[in-house]
Amino acid sequence: MFLRHVIVFSLIALLTGCAGLTSREAVQGKGDPAQWREHKQQLSSLDGWQINGKVGIRAPKDSGSGTLFWLQRQDYYDIRLSGPLGRGAARLTGRPGAVALEVANQGRYEATTPETLLQDQLGWKLPVSHLVWWVRGLPAPDSKSSVTLDGDSRLASLEQDGWQVEYLSYVEQNGYWLPERVKLHGQDLDVTLVIKDWQPRKLGQ
């Protein structure tokens, strides 16, 4: 089940480039909508980061955990998994139009989009481009969402495209409040992301 785990998380943790800021969202919760808008504007300006952390995957017949490294440089990404989840290593790299997944001792897989790669390998349809937004604590701007704010006007939870995302804790890094512990709940798939180290960047200025 190693390849299945690798493809599931790697592709959920993917992006196909940053879309516009406009978001069709319903807002509720304890926070101030004006402060939330300012928070979104600040985080949307981040187009680069380096993340080190852990990821856990739970599905009806599969489960596992491992370490995560995610390098983002505008529309280029380099995501690596290792540890018990991989029992080895896997690396996912690409930019819009070209995605490659390399799995130790198992081969290389290519597609034009992460969605296509997931569909081809597993036959699953998931909003794999959304995590580039979700990992920053933002709803993806290209579809409707329902957000609940915490007392600090940051995301407490998010519902979008059949997924529920819970933000359990945040950490401040370089003036940005960024998610530290996140749980994603989809149909027959749960993902837990614990980010140990955030290094946010603004590259496109």
UniProtKB/Swiss-Prot annotation:
Residues 1-17 form the signal peptide. It is found in: Cell outer membrane. InterPro entries: LolA/LolB/LppX, OM_lipoprot_LolB. One of its GO terms (cellular component) is cell outer membrane. GO terms for biological process: lipoprotein localization to outer membrane; protein transport. Keywords: Cell outer membrane, Chaperone, Lipoprotein, Membrane, Palmitate, Protein transport, Signal, Transport. Its main location: membrane. A lipid is attached at residue 18 (N-palmitoyl cysteine). It is a lipid-anchor. Disulfide bonds: none annotated. A lipid is attached at residue 18 (S-diacylglycerol cysteine). Plays a critical role in the incorporation of lipoproteins in the outer membrane after they are released by the LolA protein. Monomer. Belongs to the LolB family. This is Outer-membrane lipoprotein LolB. It comes from Pseudomonas savastanoi pv. phaseolicola (strain 1448A / Race 6) (Pseudomonas syringae pv. phaseolicola (strain 1448A / Race 6)). The lineage of its organism: Bacteria, Pseudomonadati, Pseudomonadota, Gammaproteobacteria, Pseudomonadales. The gene is lolB.
